[in-house]
């Protein structure tokens, strides 16, 4: 038997970190068992589903490296097929037309709640005779068994049993003729020979209903594994209201690497000893469904930042270059050449946690000129600053060899000649050429800028200082 798992997102919103964790677990399990991973787009909700979200889901899965063996399949392409199956189920007495109005169902619900009962459909139309039909509008409901129970062994949570009397007759086709999620997913899992359904714990209540439909169709029952929720750092349900990044697109724009995200996400509910850093091959080797936690996991931004900086400094140069190219292009920064990007990683990688932070700092290298911050200039520059910058300009003007060693030697000799502290000289130069108070090694920054741009920045700073008033 070939192990087959699936990831079945609905394109009604951005790809969510919790959804990606589910996809990753399903992908890892399939790979660990030499099985297949299926991508299925559940787009029957035509009002909320969009092509833009579909493209975003597919692009982000590809970016993460979660490639699928089959698909993507689209439920919207199979609507007529689902309807034909439902028609046959009605003819076989496995489903029936329900003519109850929304008003009647609402009154029924309120009445049941007033009696302290769990609200569910009372099956009025299940035994309806033709002469009593007063409407042409209807939904189609599945004939759920009256007696017995549904028992399944969840690979994460163990044995789960639900009495059939607790379940109502599920709507499997809406009044507009569109089959419902709970029906389509069953047919797809059957037709695609899905052996293991790995999904969020919010689907546990759907499972007995889906099993009953599968049994009615004499189909094989897959093995289920319901993973726990992902919560915010303050243990709340993920929401835009708590200012938590939740979509993969947002993480990407913020400069997180796919390698660090996967490493971070896999640990939200799974572990292997005390190991923190996992390659994809190690994830596949060690992953089991039984090792997943039952309890919810909380996001940890500090952990993600730590992982991201690790991967920025340890990924192969060709890989990090590709990701930096994307980040620079997104920010409309025209970098000189690809070799520049690798120099930037070496220059800034140990100081910053995300690619976006590297890009933001790098603007000072690529902007035509520095937009000086008046507060920084007035706080850190004084009457000696003009003298320092003039000295540096004159010293570097005729320099023919441009490398870190030569720059360092010339900078040290300038400090000696000025008889001003190295700290003061370096701060003045740093602000003049980058606009920042902090920077990586100053000699490396000067070398990266190049002679012409470095001298131009010094001249611009001198011009700015000329118009400043210092206390005597």
From Swiss-Prot:
Q: Which domain of life is it from?
A: Bacteria
- The short sequence motif called 'HIGH' region sits at 9-19
Q: Which GO terms describe its molecular function?
A: ATP binding; glutamate-tRNA ligase activity; tRNA binding; zinc ion binding
Biological process terms from the Gene Ontology for this record are: glutamyl-tRNA aminoacylation
An annotated GO cellular component of this protein is: cytosol
State which Enzyme Commission number(s) the record gives. 6.1.1.17
Residues engaged in binding ATP: 240
At which positions is motif 'KMSKS' region?
A: 237-241
Its keywords, alphabetically, are: Aminoacyl-tRNA synthetase, ATP-binding, Cytoplasm, Ligase, Nucleotide-binding, Protein biosynthesis
* Subunit: Monomer.
Which family does the similarity line name? Belongs to the class-I aminoacyl-tRNA synthetase family. Glutamate--tRNA ligase type 1 subfamily.
Q: What is the name listed in the Swiss-Prot or TrEMBL entry for this protein?
A: Glutamate--tRNA ligase
Species name for this entry? Buchnera aphidicola subsp. Baizongia pistaciae (strain Bp)
Gene responsible for this protein: gltX
């Amino acid at each position: 038997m070939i192990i087959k798992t699936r990831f079945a997102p609905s394109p009604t919103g951005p790809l969510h970190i919790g959804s990606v964790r589910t996809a990753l677990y399903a992908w890892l399990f399939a790979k660990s068992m030499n099985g297949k991973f299926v991508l299925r787009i559940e787009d029957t909700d035509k009002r909320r589903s969009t092509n833009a979200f579909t493209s975003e889901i597919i692009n982000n899965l590809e970016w993460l490296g979660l490639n699928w063996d089959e698909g993507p399949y689209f439920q919207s392409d199979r609507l007529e097929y689902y309807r034909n199956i439902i028609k046959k189920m009605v003819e076989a007495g496995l489903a029936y037309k329900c003519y109850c109005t929304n008003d009647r169902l609402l009154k029924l619900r309120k009445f049941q709640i007033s009696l302290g009962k769990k609200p569910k459909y009372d099956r009025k139309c299940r035994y309806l005779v033709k002469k009593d039909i007063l409407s042409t509008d209807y939904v189609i409901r599945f004939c759920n068994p009256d007696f017995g129970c549904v028992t399944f062994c969840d690979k994460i949570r163990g044995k789960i049993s639900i009495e059939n009397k607790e379940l109502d007759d599920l709507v499997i086709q809406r009044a507009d003729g569109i089959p419902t999620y709970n029906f389509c997913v069953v047919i797809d899992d059957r037709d695609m020979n899905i052996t293991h359904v790995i999904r969020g714990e919010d689907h546990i209540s759907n499972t007995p209903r889906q099993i009953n439909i599968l049994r009615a169709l004499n189909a094989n029952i897959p093995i289920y594994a319901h993973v726990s929720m992902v919560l915010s750092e303050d243990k709340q349900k993920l929401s835009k209201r708590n200012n938590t990044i939740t979509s993969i697109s947002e993480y990407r724009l913020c400069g997180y690497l796919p390698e660090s995200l996967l490493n971070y996400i896999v640990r939200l509910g799974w572990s292997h000893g005390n190991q923190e850093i996992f390659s994809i091959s190690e994830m596949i080797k060690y992953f089991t469904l039984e090792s997943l936690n039952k309890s919810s996991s909380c996001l940890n931004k500090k952990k993600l930042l730590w992982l991201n900086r690790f991967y920025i400094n340890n990924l192969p140069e060709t890989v990090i270059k590709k990701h930096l190219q994307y980040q620079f292009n997104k920010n409309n920064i025209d970098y000189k050449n690809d070799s520049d990007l690798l120099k930037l990683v070496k220059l800034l990688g140990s100081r910053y946690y995300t690619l976006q932070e590297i890009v933001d700092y790098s603007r000072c290298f690529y902007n035509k000129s520095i937009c000086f911050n008046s507060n920084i200039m007035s706080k850190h520059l004084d009457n000696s600053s003009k003298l320092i910058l003039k000295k540096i300009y004159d010293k570097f003007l005729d320099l023919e060899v441009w490398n870190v060693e030569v720059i360092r030697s010339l900078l040290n000799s300038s400090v000696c000649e000025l008889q001003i502290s190295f700290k003061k000289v370096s701060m003045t130069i740093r602000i003049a050429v980058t606009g920042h108070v902090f920077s990586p090694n100053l000699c490396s920054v000067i070398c990266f800028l190049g002679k012409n741009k470095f001298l131009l920045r010094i001249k611009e700073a001198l011009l700015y200082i000329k118009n400043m008033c210092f206390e005597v």
